[in-house]
């Protein structure tokens, strides 16, 4: 069987125009996949040089396949049909290990054609390392490595205005472009680089904050043999991802022309402020996940897909999003409903087995950040509590009992994953309920009164403790399926 490389699979190679910090599955099935589409369908003509930002030889470099690899995009499309789209990605030219090839790394700054810089160095990647210096080869932190490269470019081109870069970090932190620029400027000051360099950074480089959204499931270990037979070649870098993707860029509108986004209809938005899109994602996608988990799991289900296929639970999720989350968000209604429909399709993706227990990690914090803002805003705007969101809170409290109904009259226990103080508190409270020394109302009040966690005393929200207590009582006495029926 043939090995995947450019000799066996010749095709067009594009000039280096993009630097990418990070070689992981996400960027390869998100940024590199989109650039490959733009290269095929427009005149973008942009090749990518990947910079491996950490000192590691695992996985092997993409150079072993001349930068080629295959994506398998699969899920439900906009019509609700299951689709599967293999694609040979040709946008990556080569990979540089900054720790082994530092001179080649600096040489990237000398290339007049380089225009864009993408990165995904994990949430911890955009961070400050006090000991980093200009003379390090390389510095430790990603922002310091980038500052060194930018300074090399500034010096090589004598501060030319047209040699600045467009920087699009994809790390999952708020306003990632702002954070990255702040650290680059901090290193410039710490290293006592010239004021003209700082002016060049500010005036001729564009740092964009981004929001990225796609579930990338990565290397499909169990399917490799079948994929090799189907495609007719060996690929060490198979990369699988869902059909849905969204790339929101907070930046100038001229980016659409530079990236040729005006010539191909990709799901990329260039906006003035990324915040409403972040709130939409957190509230609808993450919020629906968080509301779903305890309800579905206590109803006897184990995966997101099973839950959405269940008539009762699927309807609960749909109504929660449509009637209690979407109405309180500040974006055009059409955009919100379209995104909500995409979320429901993603939840129903038959190619992804998303375990409810894996999503349950740190459920208390997730409820505070993902659902509580909508719950409180709904009450403020409508003068009443959103019944399904409060039911999700009651279900979450019930979930921390650590047991659900099994076959017959048996109880099934399961692992709980949260901060130790919550696990200890719930263990004590639920033991008290079992021994009739703590009432459900007392349990709910203890949970809601924790101002350190909720950042306020939720027992002061009129009617909340009473409503959650009543809903919890129904769950305990009648079981989850009977309890949730009234909200479907």
UniProtKB/Swiss-Prot annotation:
Organism domain of life: Bacteria
Keyword Oxidoreductase applies: yes
HAMAP family: Altron_oxidoreduct (MF_00670)
Binding locations of NAD(+): 18-29
Gene Ontology cellular component annotations, sorted alphabetically: cytosol
Membership in a protein family: Belongs to the mannitol dehydrogenase family. UxaB subfamily.
Catalytic activity from the UniProt record: D-altronate + NAD(+) = keto-D-tagaturonate + NADH + H(+)
InterPro entries: 6-PGluconate_DH-like_C_sf, 6PGD_dom2, Altronate_OxRdtase, Mannitol_DH_C, Mannitol_DH_N, NAD(P)-bd_dom_sf
Name of the protein: Altronate oxidoreductase
Pathway field: Carbohydrate metabolism; pentose and glucuronate interconversion
SUPFAM superfamilies: 6-phosphogluconate dehydrogenase C-terminal domain-like, NAD(P)-binding Rossmann-fold domains
Keywords from the UniProt entry: NAD, Oxidoreductase
